[in-house]
Amino acid sequence: MRLSILAPVFGVLLLTACGGSSPSSASLPTVPTSPSGPTTPAAVTITGHLTATSGGNALANVSVDLGGLKTVTAAEGTFSYRFQPGTTSRLTFSADSIVPRSLVVAISQTRGLEVDAIALGSGFDLAFYRRLIRNDYGTPGILQPLRRWTRTPSIYLKTVDEAGEAILPGFLDQVENTVKDAVTRWTGGELGTPTVERGTDSREGVSGWITIKYPHIGATDRCGQAQVAVDGGWIELEYHVPGTSTAGCRVPGYIVAPRTIRHEIGHALGLYHTGDPSDLMSGLTWLDYQANLQPTAHELRAVSIAYHRPIGNVDPDTDPSSSVNLAPLRIAIP
């Protein structure tokens, strides 16, 4: 929705005129003073600079629309507006070279504005981005708003399963080490190394935490599941794998493969399945040699862009007008 620039508010300045006295005893009549006209607020200037989200290169020849006022970015990616002040207005960018971009900006005072847009080409694949970030593989055509963390989550690592049975310390060490690396690796350092606390309790529903837990009776069709970017959410790892399981979770040397842990952390950070067997977030059955798979380069490229957008950003690249609350989603993997 595009918001028009608000009309300026005019104030009226009231002046009081006082008559003087002459040397004579007769007073001169007071001459009435006409009221002043309306005062026009000083114009404000918005000076902007448009760059690529990945790489930071200037984006030239991009059409700009601010509240219905149009211009084009210069060779250096710059643009400028001068008008009467308002409050906020929607700013949009469009060109064959970028994914259309839209955001809301304040226009109440003179200011500089740094904006970035997703440049097409150079390895960026919009269809892949929609699968990984908007769940277009899991629910084709029903694109999700962006979900992510805005601060580094703390991890609560349960030391017992859901029935109270103790978990092997060596397995807990593996999970902790994998999680600490995965959070920073997935986000390219946008999130730091998480604090990990161990115990028999839970931090589900507690803001700032992700709880890692283990069902007492293992599932037969998956190796894990997680809520997608839920503050106070959880990850389940299938520590107890039934003999009837068709998921193929166990591999030599691991109770739960490192790739499964990294995959579930990906969900907890806001990612979905891609359907590509070469990806860590594929959501497909994998082979033993992939048990220690790391995120691929094109997965990391897409996540880096997503972590430069606010929660609630919608397709193709439109920021919300205000903060949003999103209902929890849960994703399971084979």
Q: Where are the language model's segments positioned?
A:
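Bacterial signal peptide processing site
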Residues: 19-23
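Short Pro-Gly-centered beta-turn/loop motif in secreted/extracellular proteins
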Residues: 29-30, 80-90, 107-109
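Short, acidic Ser/Thr/Gly-rich low-complexity loop/linker segments typical of extracellular
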Residues: 60, 65-82
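C-terminal motif of bacterial Sec signal peptides marking the signal peptidase cleavage site
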Residues: 14-17
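Disordered inhibitory propeptide/activation segment of secreted metzincin zinc metalloprotease zymogens
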Residues: 31-38, 96-173, 309-334
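Metalloprotease/metallohydrolase-associated module, dominated by Zn2+-dependent proteases
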Residues: 233-256, 272-334
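Metzincin-family zinc-dependent endopeptidase catalytic domain
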Residues: 171-277, 286
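Short, ordered, surface-exposed loop/turn motifs in non-cytosolic proteins
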Residues: 44-47, 52-68, 176
